[in-house]
Amino acid sequence: MNLSFASLWEKISDLIPEEDALICGDDVLSWREFDIRASKLASALIENGLSKNSKVAIYLNNSNEYLIAQYAIFKIDGCPINVNYRYVEDELTYLLENSDSEAVFFHSTYSNRIDNIKSSLPNIKLWVEVDDSSQKSSAIGVNYQNIIDNYQPMARIERDPNTIYML
């Protein structure tokens, strides 16, 4: 068995689909729900031109969406790039450029920072905005919930055990 995170979590999802996988406050997801949501995000990543070894920045606070995004990246054999929530525009631009990120997941609370740097990052193919309690929103990102509501789950794939999974 391939011991990549995605392959392992898919196997767990098959074995105990109704058991709790993620708990964040009152938001509880089963392994089946975790797998389906990540598969839908993975479909969106692929549709936007990402593939094996693509780097994807995660500019999210601790949340279920963070882990779902990370799982989606692992599903396409990509590499998640963690982004410190304290980073300001110059640091964000530097990290996103130098990590070769092709997509970014971000919470709405950071939308002003994202709005300020987007035009200087033409290699980013997909911006995914995750709503939070900040009541901020931007017009630059695809809404996370729209992806969950409208995409079909990605078919499972065989993964390369030598893929870079963390930078």
What does each of the following model-derived ranges do?
Residues 2, 18-63, 67-71, 88-93, ...:
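Conserved AMP-binding/adenylate-forming core of the ANL superfamily
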Residues 9, 69, 114:
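Aromatic/hydrophobic pocket-lining residues that form π-stacking "cages" and hydrophobic walls in ligand
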Residues 12-17:
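Flexible acidic/glycine-rich loop/turn elements at helix↔coil and beta-strand↔loop transitions
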Residues 47-48, 75-146:
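Structural core segment of the AMP-binding/adenylate-forming
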Residues 129, 149-167:
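Conserved pre-ATP/AMP-binding loop-to-beta segment of ANL
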